[in-house]
Design a protein with these regions (language model features):
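Motif-centric detector for short Cys/His coordination patterns
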Residues: 2-197
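Active-site environment of non-heme Fe oxygenases that use a 2-His-1-carboxylate facial triad
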Residues: 174-216, 221-463
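A positional/structural detector of protein chain ends, strongest at the extreme C-terminus
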Residues: 1-4, 461-463
């Protein structure tokens, strides 16, 4: 039986502010700047006008209302009883947009058949009914043009998912990261035959799962042709294009425009940190490697930060690495790029980790940016607290370059390594160009594209 028209208790517009999530680093930076600002001015000048107290009260009220709405939704209820009768706990504009019927969402391309900008501001629920299974049917007043007499249906599971979190989860929770050093890196579990990787979705899921967990895998028995790395990278996502091209050669050349194209030692670094969004995954496919030297080295920066968290001194340096920006740049061969980044980047969303001595300290760890060879050489006014930052980087670098942290291997022809470029640093020992040949082929994949592949394969991975 159809229920009467319902009202909606409108949240204050300021409620949108309560959903803005800041990383711990952003919060700490703002707190510090405010603290310095307060010290520099007379106390009387920092007294805020009463409007801020009113704003805070509205924020608290809106947050409480939103929490109550989520509780109602999580119970499978779209409407609650209010002073004036049934009240929809979701704004009617948002509820109208949530309709996924074939008239609203194209079944083939999964895109909207209308523009959300055309939803009338005065749209409202006209009638609603709920069947025995808890599913809702809703009709509308002042609906979109061309959608007269439209009926939207929402399943009970759909309604419950809206209350589960602010952003509904479409895949199973992500597996925990596994932190490693020289002694704990799971080499056997991180090595996969090429044909297993490209031969089936199950094989690909195993590689993607391990790459997510450890940030470093090896693919063996690959064809030794120049196009093989393109095919391999495409299993993870579209190739990331940079000024080096979709793929590039890593071998010693005269007059090199990048230290990677020399025979010299190349210390621990990450690639393209001077770009707006650096590639998160890098592939290096070995086509030839008969030179003396040229061993590849890898280290897990997350594990290094775990070791830093073991002492008060390390914790202090860790905080500095979160707060202080470092400038990276590339100005060569007609290219001009620069970017400022704190060494350690945090996320507002917790991420569990294994093989960590201090998991609580790392629960919000997101990315690390470390690339000393590609730092910007000129002084910058962003280099605040330069002595504290340098001391913190000394501390981090000492642990990073310790024998305990380093996994070393000499790539052989037909082997490809794939690693998380924003977690795992890589280095290369010097090699003798007169003793043989060394030729690697490289490619990148963006983090968002890899995450899409991960989500599509999640059901084939361990829970």
């Amino acid at each position: 039986m159809a229920q009467p028209r319902t009202s909606f208790t409108k949240l204050p517009s300021i409620a949108l502010r309560s959903f803005v999530l800041r990383s711990p680093a952003q919060t700490c930076t703002r707190t510090r700047l405010l603290s310095h600002s307060a010290q520099a001015r007379p106390a009387a000048r920092v007294v805020r006008p009463p409007k801020y107290a009113v704003r805070q009260e509205r924020l608290v009220s809106a947050s409480s209302t939103a929490a109550a709405s989520r509780r109602t939704l999580s119970q499978g209820s779209l409407f609650s009883e209010g002073p004036s009768g049934s009240e929809c706990v979701i704004h009617p504009i948002l509820l109208r947009k949530a309709c996924t019927c074939p008239h609203c969402i194209n079944p083939s391309d999964k895109q909207f058949n209308y523009s959300s900008a055309d939803i009338p501001l005065d749209i409202a629920v006209d009638t609603w009914k709920q069947d025995a299974a808890g599913n809702y049917s809703v009709t509308w007043k002042n609906d979109l043009p061309g959608y007269q007499d439209h009926v939207s249906t929402f399943s009970a599971d759909q309604v419950r998912s809206w209350g589960a979190a602010e952003v509904p989860k479409r895949v199973s929770p992500s597996p925990p990261k596994f932190l490693w050093d020289k002694d704990s890196f799971p080499l056997d579990a991180s090595t996969f035959p090429y044909h297993d990787f490209v031969g089936s979705a199950q094989g690909r899921a195993k590689v993607v799962y391990q790459l997510w967990r450890t940030g470093l895998v090896f693919i063996t028995h690959m064809p030794t042709d120049e196009k093989a790395v393109e095919h391999l990278a495409a299993q993870l996502g579209p190739l990331y294009n940079s000024f080096y091209g979709l793929t590039w050669d890593v071998r010693s050349v005269p007059g090199a425009k990048n230290v990677a194209y020399t025979h010299r030692f190349l210390g621990f670094h990450m690639d393209l940190l001077y770009m707006h969004e650096p590639p998160q995954y890098q592939l290096l496919h070995c086509l030839e490697n008969t030179c003396t030297g040229g061993e590849s080295q890898f280290a897990d920066t997350f594990k290094v930060l775990d070791r830093m968290a073991a002492s008060p001194e390390g914790q202090r340096h860790l905080q500095t690495l979160q707060l202080t920006p470092q400038r990276y740049g590339y100005f060569n061969d007609g290219h001009h790029y620069t970017r400022n980044r704190a060494t350690v980047s945090s996320s507002p969303f917790p991420q569990p980790c294994e093989n960590a001595d201090h998991p609580a300290a790392l629960s919000h760890l997101d990315r690390v940016y470390w690339s000393p060879p590609f730092e910007y050489p000129a002084p910058s006014d962003l280099e605040q607290d330069i002595e504290a930052n340098t001391a913190a980087r000394h501390f981090f670098s000492h642990l990073l370059n310790s024998d305990q942290a380093i996994v070393e291997t000499k790539l052989t022809a037909g082997t490809c390594t794939i690693f998380n470029n924003l977690r795992v640093v890589h280095a290369r020992r010097a090699f003798d160009v007169n003793s043989g040949k060394r030729w690697l082929k490289g490619a990148y994949v963006a983090g968002q594209d890899f995450n899409s592949t991960f989500a599509s394969l999640r059901d084939l991975m361990p829970s």
